Amino acid sequence: MTDVHLMGTVHCTKVCWDIMKEQEYGRIVVTSSSSGLYGNFGQTNYGAAKMGVIGMMNTLAQEGAKYNVKINALAPTAGTRMTEGLIDEKAFALLTPETVTPAVLYLVSEDAPTRTILAAGAGSFAVAKIVETEGMWLPEAEQTPEGIAANWTQISEGGERALQAGYEQGIKMVGQAAKGLGLETG
């Protein structure tokens, strides 16, 4: 499963990556899935592979930015052999490839965004985002499982934002610690 859905995506992307960088233009659309974004019973390996594609997209979006190479992910909802018989026939009939095609065409357009997960199906479109709460810093004495449990509401709710790079999480957390400890940081 990972060989096809994750490594297949890696290999296809690698073939065109240097060409797009050299010409300073490129658009890549990878395929993810709601099974990767949200989970789906019985599809652990498929979901893991499809979420791995998102990690690849996030990193390549940073690497391709200065070359005008944009990469996005499509999370399609479509009637397929995998979904046939699992959903109502009328609903299945709405989930045609034609209702997903406009999303792909937009993601490869000159004005496409980058690092975006575009969900599409049955003529509906939405952007899926990975967000992190503001969270909070805990004094050393409270840095325990019990301290986390006691502060769970503040840790888990509020201030959701989509981080643009992994280092932003570290900067945020160090900033919270410095503030909590009354330290000046540069």
Map each language-model feature to its residues.
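Conserved catalytic-site region of short-chain dehydrogenase/reductase
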Residues: 36-38, 80
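Active-site helix of classical SDR
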Residues: 13, 49
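Catalytic Tyr-X3-Lys loop
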Residues: 1-10, 25, 29, 53
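Active-site-adjacent segment of SDR/Rossmann-fold oxidoreductases
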Residues: 19-20, 38, 54, 59-70, ...
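Flexible, glycine-rich beta-alpha linker
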Residues: 69-88
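Active-site loop-to-helix junction immediately N-terminal to the catalytic Tyr of the SDR YXXXK motif
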Residues: 39-47, 87
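Residue(s) in the substrate-gating loop at a strand-loop-helix junction
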Residues: 33
